[in-house]
């Protein structure tokens, strides 16, 4: 696992974007695994800038997203399909027919089967990841066991509370979500995690601890053959990480 400590969020976003930039230029038909949340937004803006100003071409790129709320249509402003359109897809020359975010409405079982089929038929080159305050990856919540494949997850109260800032009230936050399984995440060729400054406990477990702990799913990144963790110096200093 490679840890890249950056002086600030701007530098972090540029360095993280470099990985995707290099992959897309080398393999124009690559499949990217994408994530939502506040952590990757700056990186997405940098990729959009490079598409507009530096000829970074997404026209043949495919993508599959980690997760989606159950019960929200793609037109809902808090759905992850809407997030991806608003923060990336509308600003680059990607063909949206080549992008996949699980369906939040309709028959849940059918939607889940389709999600697993798409993942299993995708050869993800780089999987973008954020991390929850409790160390969850996508919506793989802490617990005694972790799932290999995509499934419908009941969200922990801490996750609901963390995501409430995006909704009018905490009561509006969906209680379930479709999420890519941990095994599917780990099968990506490269993992790219952006760890924001308020994730101190998860950072301690991942960067300072020795355990692979299902109660802190992000620790399983230690097993991956090509994983990158990007964080700011402020967070590294907070937890005492010196490399």
Can you say where each PLM-predicted feature lies in the sequence?
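N-terminal glycine-/serine-/threonine-rich phosphate-binding loop
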Residues: 1-32, 109
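Glycine-rich N-terminal segment of FAD-binding domains in flavoprotein oxidoreductases
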Residues: 26-52
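Short beta-strand segments
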Residues: 33-37, 65, 102, 128-131, ...
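A glycine- and small-aliphatic-rich helix-loop capping segment at beta-alpha/alpha-beta transitions
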Residues: 46-57, 80, 142-151
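Ligand-binding beta-strand-loop-alpha-helix segment within the catalytic cores
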Residues: 56-127
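Glycine-rich phosphate-binding loop
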Residues: 122-147
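Class I SAM-dependent methyltransferase SAM-binding "motif I" and its flanking Rossmann-like core
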Residues: 138-182
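ATP/nucleoside-binding phosphotransfer catalytic cores, i.e., glycine-rich phosphate-binding loops
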Residues: 183, 187-243
């Amino acid at each position: 696992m490679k840890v890249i400590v950056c002086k600030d969020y701007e530098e972090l976003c540029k360095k993280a974007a470099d990985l995707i930039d290099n992959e897309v230029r080398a393999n124009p038909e690559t499949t990217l695994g994408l994530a939502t949340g506040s952590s990757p937004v700056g990186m997405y803006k940098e990729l959009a800038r490079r598409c507009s100003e530096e000829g970074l071409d997404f026209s043949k790129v495919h993508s599959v997203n980690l997760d989606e709320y159950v019960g929200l249509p793609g037109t809902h402003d808090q759905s992850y399909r809407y997030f991806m359109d608003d923060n990336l897809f509308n600003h680059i020359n990607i063909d949206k027919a080549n992008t996949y975010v699980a369906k939040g409405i309709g028959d849940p079982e059918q939607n889940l089967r389709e999600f697993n089929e798409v993942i299993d038929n995708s050869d993800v080159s780089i999987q973008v990841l954020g991390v929850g305050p409790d160390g969850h990856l996508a919506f793989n919540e802490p617990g005694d066991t972790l799932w290999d494949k995509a499934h419908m997850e009941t969200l922990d109260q801490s996750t609901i509370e963390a995501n409430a800032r995006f909704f009018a009230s905490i009561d509006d936050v969906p209680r379930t979500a479709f999420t890519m399984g941990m095994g599917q995440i780990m099968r990506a060729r490269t993992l790219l995690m952006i760890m924001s400054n308020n994730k101190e406990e998860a950072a301690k477990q991942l960067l300072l601890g020795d355990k692979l702990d299902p109660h802190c799913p992000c620790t399983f990144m230690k097993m991956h053959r090509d994983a990158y963790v990007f964080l700011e110096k402020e967070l590294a200093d907070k937890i005492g990480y010196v490399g």
